[in-house]
Amino acid sequence: MPRTAEIIAVGSELLDGGVTNTNAAFLSRLLTAAGVEVLYHTTVDDDAARLEKAVTIARGRAELLVFTGGLGPTYDDMTKTAVCAALDTPLVLHQEVVEDMRRYFEKVFRREMPECDMQQAYLPEGCTVFRNPVGTAPGCVFTAGKTTAALLPGVPHECRYMAEHCLLPWLEQVRGQTVRSHTLHIFGLTEPQVQELLGDLLRREADMTLAPYAKPGEVMLQLSARGADERACEARMAPVLAEVRARLGAYFYGADVSGLEETVLTLCRERGLTLAAAESCTGGLIAKRLTDIPGASQVFLGGVVSYTNHVKQQVLHVPENLLARCGAVSAEVARAMALGVRVLTGADLAVSVTGLAGPDGDDRGNPVGTVFVGLSAPEGVTVRHLTLGGDRERIRTLSAHHAFDMLRRYLTNLPTEGE
């Protein structure tokens, strides 16, 4: 089994800033969890000569080369051609791939496959084909001398599917061991704080990994183990997971979830509770994140984006004299918004957000980053006062995180940190 890897992303759009390379981060986590050390990330534009040169350099410093992008049917999709030229491997037509693509076009597009798509069925001779049920471009893995090359689509959801369902099982088969992993989610602590609490548990070993990485507003831990089978892997991870939960306490909010919003929806669904939201500075972000999850309609009744005082008054019935006395960005208005949307929708629970995401503060001396998050429940209304740093996007993202965290804490009988 390859022990070292280089990830090579192909696409001019990745270099001109038009597209963010999310595939590299995901693949690095997957390979690391599988026991493959990622040594380099390389990005190459849509130029065959430069890609061939990159392959020549990479094969001298890593055993596994993982390529993303450039597998489609257009003129600039030349990854297979350049990689096979550099590794002296011919391309051959794979008839089973042709049939897969024809069925996909008939099912999804209700038409015949265009002739130009036929080039996607040409793959390296002797390769293991990675079929693609979520797109048209197949991937593959093959070995040339001491180099193993894996070719994956560049479209993120296709790349992720193929990496998880094709590349990872292939690595396990080659190694003769099973790899299993869990992503643990933490909110309310910084990465250094997590490391301080878990210091002796963090490790990168041959058969066990527990490593932190941060995203805006939260910290995640990648826990993975290798063993003879899935049961053995889970048995190795169980005591570590239990210790992480014990040390982090209320800051640990879930494993293998998409985010705080999924945790909140699950908790509400289990308790038969409904939810609503009133948003000002987040501009509908809370509602979006909830409705991104299938089945959210069982819990989320609706939301109001009350960006102006007029809408706060007319729709949420926030008193005009309250706005005049306290200002739109205040604990009092956050309370009124949360209660107003709960009454309006008839929801069991409601959250509200009002704040200053920038670029300027308000005329009452509140600086950018001042945010109030309200939670209205049958027992009453609580408010969390935040002072957040960063740009407009970060402030909005963190504000939504805190709204979900207040809900999570309420639903699990933890202090909501209201004031």
Explain the meaning of each model-derived region.
Residues 142-217, 222-224, 232-237:
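Accessory alpha-helical/coil subdomains and C-terminal extensions
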Residues 50, 56, 60, 77-174:
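Proline/glycine-rich low-complexity loops and linkers
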